[in-house]
């Protein structure tokens, strides 16, 4: 159940972050900019904290690696491709590219899902960093200014932030 709660928090936060992000970039409603920016920053913190909580939970909360079983392991173990399903990566890629009709058999998570479970927390952290580097109250802090200089300025940081949304 805790995993379901973090999943729904992520979903709601991401949808509202996309909506407020578009309204910040394309202001379509007069007088809404302050609200949009405030909600955007708040939800960025919510998403980041929820991501950290979810990663910590992966090491301490157990779940079933297969459907319909009582055997439980700590959740991070289901995120890693195991030796018994690592060979299925090609089959999963063919399935998702519509070259293969049959769904590859697997455990709780398929190999592409496992890779995304490893990548998404990293991407959320990078997105949070780029967001704080673009936010006026923190953009001049040395930690964020150095990153902005490293990528070539605020416009490059903004492009990275936009790209991470997709």
Model region roles, listed by residue range:
Residues 1-166:
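Membrane-embedded alpha-helical bundles that constitute the cytochrome b-like, heme-associated redox core
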